[in-house]
């Protein structure tokens, strides 16, 4: 079974027949490069690569990865997503592209889809809070606030209004984190850079969800640059931001609550400098493992009548959106029901 591989150390990647050879490289005090024991990865095992350290590779490697349909996602020192190498889009459809563009240009349609993304996200936030409310955390007032704000979404006539409501919903939702978490405090939401451990995990987890959504979008006929909730812009795949809104509460946030409350992560897994807090290498490995386990978790899908993983669920969401855009079936966002 194919899986994601994460490269946290700087190194050199080469093709060796049908195998990827990754050689970690460290630099000593004399600024000399020292090659470490290489690692060999059969290409059949690789779904995608996440690169957090400096990577040296040549065009032959990327040609090989492109032929095998393997994307590579790159991140800077501060864990910010910087871009992706994506294989040639073999599934692109002129009909789908025209329909998606038309849906964006149709103000009524764009508002309708934007509203549904946030309705799905808000529902899943409430389901998250209900889970912990039943387990003794006093979250009812926050739940009521989110429901009240969500009920105003049908009256919103513009995407900006929907974004404003979404901001208020998320602000209320984040106040629950300090109640749910036993030993960590979030305070206010801070980004670029995150100022504490909880904010660091939210940023890192959201980034992982975004890139997983990009992978799913790339496997359909959707164009990742044409979005409905977030404004399409240069140098970003804004449709992935739209779709990932639905899944951040039930994937990212649930993983955060789990790894912190079960003490899989502690303050020793973070590097804090001035007003900046980031996961260290050991912390990243623990969190990535927890995210991958969540992606692979399965549940009984009501409509399909079979078990599906959360990773496959994201892809199903892309197909549902595509069907709506093509006029086949009305889009209904995934709403957690347990």
Question: What spans do the regions from the language model cover?
Answer:
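Active-site helix-to-loop segments that bind/position phosphate- or nucleotide-bearing substrates
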Residues: 1-30, 40, 92-338
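Short, conserved beta-strand segments within well-ordered enzyme catalytic domains
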Residues: 14, 21, 48-51, 71-74
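Extracellular/luminal Protease-associated
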Residues: 41-56
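A surface-exposed, charged beta-strand/loop segment in the N-terminal or early-internal portion
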Residues: 53-124
């Amino acid at each position: 079974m194919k899986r994601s591989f994460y490269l946290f150390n700087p190194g050199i990647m080469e093709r060796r027949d049908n195998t990827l050879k990754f050689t970690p490289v460290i630099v000593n005090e004399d600024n000399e490069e020292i090659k470490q024991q290489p690692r060999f990865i059969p290409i059949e095992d690789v779904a995608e690569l996440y690169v957090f350290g400096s990577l040296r590779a040549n065009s032959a490697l990327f040609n090989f990865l492109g032929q095998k349909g393997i994307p590579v996602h790159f991140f800077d020192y501060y864990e910010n997503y910087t871009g992706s190498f994506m294989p040639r889009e073999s599934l692109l459809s002129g009909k789908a592209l025209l329909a998606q563009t038309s849906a964006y240009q149709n103000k009524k349609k764009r508002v309708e889809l934007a509203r549904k993304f946030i309705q799905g996200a808000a529902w899943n936030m409430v389901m998250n809070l209900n889970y912990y409310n039943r387990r003794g955390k006093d979250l009812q007032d926050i739940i009521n606030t989110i429901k009240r704000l969500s009920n105003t979404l049908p009256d919103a006539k513009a995407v900006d209004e929907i974004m404003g409501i979404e901001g208020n919903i998320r602000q209320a939702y984040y106040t629950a984190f300090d109640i749910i978490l036993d030993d960590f405090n979030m305070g206010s939401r801070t980004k670029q850079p995150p100022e504490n451990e909880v904010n660091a995990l939210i940023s890192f987890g959201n980034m992982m969800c975004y890139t997983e959504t990009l992978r799913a979008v790339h496997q359909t006929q959707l164009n990742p640059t044409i979005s409905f909730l977030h404004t399409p812009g240069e140098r970003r795949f804004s449709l992935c931001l739209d779709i990932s809104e639905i899944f951040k509460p039930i994937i990212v946030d649930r993983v955060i609550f789990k790894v912190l409350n079960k003490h899989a992560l502690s303050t020793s897994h973070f590097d804090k400098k001035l007003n900046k807090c980031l996961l260290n290498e050991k912390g990243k490995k623990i969190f990535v493992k927890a995210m991958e386990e969540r992606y692979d978790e399965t549940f009984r899908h009501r409509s399909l009548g079979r078990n599906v993983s959360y990773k496959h669920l994201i892809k199903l969401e892309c197909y549902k959106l595509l069907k709506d855009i093509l006029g086949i079936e009305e889009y209904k966002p995934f709403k957690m029901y347990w």
